[in-house]
C-alpha cells in the first residue's frame, strides 16, 4: 500500500511540473506575438511617415517635361500605372492596341481639346499637293506627296516621329552591307563563281527555309551573308553547301525566336556537313564579315512602300514573290535593297493596274526613297531585265516557283508569269506606258 501511495504522489508532481511548463510556453508565445504586432505597427507607421514626408508623382520624380510620351501633359495616375504593371507581368506580349492604351497618358478633356485643334489645322498639317524635301541623301524635291507618317502620329507603335531618321539611317546602312562587287558577273575576279552554282545554292536555301518555317527576313539575310562572304573568299565546290547552311544558321540566330536545332541543320545537308563543321564554319564566316550581321532587310523597304499603296494585300503578295525572285537572280546582288523593293512594288502595281492614273504618284516616290520609275531609264532597264528573267525562267528556281504556286502564298506565280510573258511578247509596251 505504501508503494502505491508513493507512486501516485510522484505522478501528481510530474503532472504539476508539466502544467507549469505548458503555462510558461503559452506566455512566451503570447509575448512573441505581441512583439511582432508592435514591430508591424512601427514599420507601417514609419513607412507612412516616409511617404507623407516626400510628395511623389505617380510614376517617377522626373519632371513631366522630361517624359517624351507625356508631351507636357499629365501622366498616368498611380493606380492606373500599377494596373499596367500587373497586366505586363501577366501578359508580356502586348498588342499594338494595348500599347496605345498603356501609353495614352492624356485625359479625355485634353484629347478633345487636341482633336479640336487638329481639326482647325488639318489643311495646314496635310502635306498633300505641297512641295517638300525628303531627308535622304541625293533625293530631289518631290511634288504632291502625302505625309502618311503624320497620319499615324498618334500610334505609338509606329514611332512616326522617328520614321524619317530611321529610314535615313537605313538608306546609308544598306550601302555599307552590300557585297563588295558582283562576283558572279566579273569573270576576271579571283572569287568568280558560275551563276548556275549560286542558283542551286539559293534555291536549296529557299527549300530548307520553307521546311524550317522561318521568317522571310531570315531568308534574305542568309542570302546577303552568303553573297558578302563569297565576294571576298574563294570557296571550293564541296564546301558550298556548308556555306549555304551556315549562312542560314547565322541568319536564324539573328532573326528567329524559336530556332531549329543544330542537329537539324546537319541532318538537312544529308551528310555534307556535320555539327562541328557548321560551328567551325560559323566562326570563320563571322570573323571574315567582322561580325557585321545587321543590315536593312528589303522587306523593311517593301513595307514602307506598301504604306503608300494603302497596304494592298494582292500587290504586297506579288511584290514579295518578285522580291524573292530578284534576290535569287545573280544579276541583281549588287543593288541596294531599297531599289529591289521599289522594282518589286512597281511591277506588282503595273500588273494589277488598279489605279492606272496614279501608277506611281508623289507619295509612292517619297516612300520609295525618291525613285521615279517613269523618268529613270536605269531603273526601267532593271525592271525589264527582271521581267524577262521571270518570263523566260533563265534562273531555274524550282523551289521558289513551287512555293509561290501554293494557295498559302496566293498562288501569285501563275498571274506573275502570265503577265511577264505577255509583256515580253509585246516588247514591254505597257510596262512604263501610262496611257
Curated annotation (Swiss-Prot):
| Cellular component, GO, one term | nucleus
Query: Does the UniProt entry include the keyword Lipid metabolism?
Result: no
**What UniProt keywords are attached to this protein's entry?**
Cell cycle, Cell division, Cyclin
Disulfide linkage: none
UniProt KW Cell division keyword: yes
Q: Where is the composition biased (Low complexity)?
A: 41-52
* Additional facts recorded: Present with 521 molecules/cell in log phase SD medium.
Q: Which family does it belong to?
A: Belongs to the cyclin family. Cyclin AB subfamily.
Q: Which PANTHER family does the UniProt record give?
A: CYCLINS
Return the protein name. S-phase entry cyclin-5
Record organism: Saccharomyces cerevisiae (strain ATCC 204508 / S288c) (Baker's yeast)
Gene this chain is encoded by: CLB5
